[in-house]
Curated annotation (Swiss-Prot):
Domains (record comment): The N-terminal domain is essential for RNAP assembly and basal transcription, whereas the C-terminal domain is involved in interaction with transcriptional regulators and with upstream promoter elements.
Region of interest (Alpha N-terminal domain (alpha-NTD)), ranges: 1-235
Keyword Transferase: yes
Annotated protein name in UniProt: DNA-directed RNA polymerase subunit alpha
Enzyme superclass (EC): transferase
Signal sequence extent: none
Transmembrane segments: none
InterPro entries, sorted: DNA-dir_RNA_pol_insert, DNA-dir_RNA_pol_RpoA/D/Rpb3, DNA-dir_RpoA, RBP11-like, RNAP_asu_C, RNApol_insert_sf
SUPFAM superfamilies reported in the protein's UniProt record: C-terminal domain of RNA polymerase alpha subunit, Insert subdomain of RNA polymerase alpha subunit, RBP11-like subunits of RNA polymerase
Cellular component terms per the entry's GO annotation: cytoplasm; DNA-directed RNA polymerase complex
Ranges where the record places region Alpha C-terminal domain (alpha-CTD): 252-321
Oligomer status and interactors: Homodimer. In cyanobacteria the RNAP catalytic core is composed of 2 alpha, 1 beta, 1 beta', 1 gamma and 1 omega subunit. When a sigma factor is associated with the core the holoenzyme is formed, which can initiate transcription.
Length: 321
């Protein structure tokens, strides 16, 4: 039986962020956590979003400057610009501009709604505060908007093509601010009337307003489908010769390369275990049968094989007919 998706609640927050609550049910036991965790990770890290990545302010050369007639210093203004919520309808970088001049007789509050943007870009939170200008003061700036995923620090990606007076910013492109999910076990009627235990997944999504929770969920689901679709047609080509060669090559590795302790090494040597191939003749249970070979030494060998070669010894002796 296919599960259903219900939208339980949606609302727009005071800061123009959006909230949505969804239910997915019925799911087989265990699938609630699988689906919820996968969606949560993709929602938080894989959805594209837009952000201000660089700002140039007239008369300012570095972020520790002050601007005459402006209450905030440059660092405060940059922090406010980072919190601008942008909806971009293009993947190309865009430029925005702001020119504000306070009247001679009163201060002026500068908000995001005063910025000038191209037709491909819009501000989602126009009431967002940027700065306060004293009477007669002027604030002029231009800024770069980019579209990307996740978080990008200036130290990791610095654009050397920008003019020197551009102040580059750490950018948060993630349009989804927060995701929460809960899984409840509920009983539903089965095919023969019996009450079967099912998972009921409740998913909560908070976005910055640049996209709706419904769109965010749709994009996340599409990403996961695209990620797993190729697995339906994976060609399973096996090469016995290659597999045998790899096994033989691994088997010839001397046990010295496992970096074992002196005690474990000497015990193996006395038991005529000289190579990995010799060691693979033993199960974890059989290692303990080697003279003077204790539990600690066995755990050391098992860990060394896994760490250096990715090999796991079988826990017990193989059954023989």
């Amino acid at each position: 039986m296919a599960y259903q998706i219900e939208c339980l609640e949606t609302r727009v927050e005071e800061d123009q962020g959006q909230y949505g609550q969804f239910a997915l049910h019925p799911l087989a036991p265990g699938q609630g956590i699988t689906v919820g965790n996968a969606l949560r990770r993709v929602l938080l890290s894989n959805l594209p979003g837009s952000a201000v990545t660089a700002v140039r302010i007239a008369g300012v050369n570095h972020e520790f400057s002050t601007i005459p007639g402006v209450r905030e210093d440059v660092m405060d203004i940059l922090l406010q610009m980072k919190q601008l919520v942008i909806r971009s309808h293009t993947s190309e970088p865009q430029m925005g501009r702001l020119f504000a001049q306070a009247p001679e007789n009163e201060p002026l509050t500068v908000t995001a709604g005063m910025v000038q943007l191209g037709s491909e870009v819009e501000v989602v939170n126009p009431n967002h505060y940027i700065a306060t200008l004293m009477p007669g003061a002027t604030l002029e700036m231009e800024f770069k908007i980019e579209k990307d995923r996740g978080y990008r620090s200036v130290e990791r990606v610095r654009d050397d093509r920008l003019a020197l007076d551009y102040l580059q910013l750490d950018a948060v492109f993630m349009p989804v601010r927060r995701v929460n999910y809960t899984v409840d076990s509920v009983r539903s009627a089965g095919a023969e009337g019996d009450r079967q235990l099912q998972d009921y997944l409740k998913l909560e999504i908070w976005t910055n307003g640049s996209l709706t929770p419904q769109d965010a969920l749709n994009q996340a689901a599409t990403i996961l489908v695209d990620l797993f679709s190729p697995l339906k047609e994976v060609p399973l080509h096996t090469s016995e010769a290659t597999a045998t060669d790899d096994h033989d090559e691994t088997g010839q590795i001397p046990i010295e390369q496992l970096n074992l302790s002196v005690r474990a090494y000497n015990c193996l040597k006395r038991a005529q275990v000289n190579t990995v191939a010799d060691l693979l003749e033993y199960s974890q249970e059989e290692l303990l049968e080697i003279k003077n070979f204790g539990q600690k030494s066995a755990e050391e060998v098992i860990e060394a094989l896994q760490k250096h070669l990715g090999i796991t010894l079988p826990p017990q002796k193989a059954a023989r007919n």
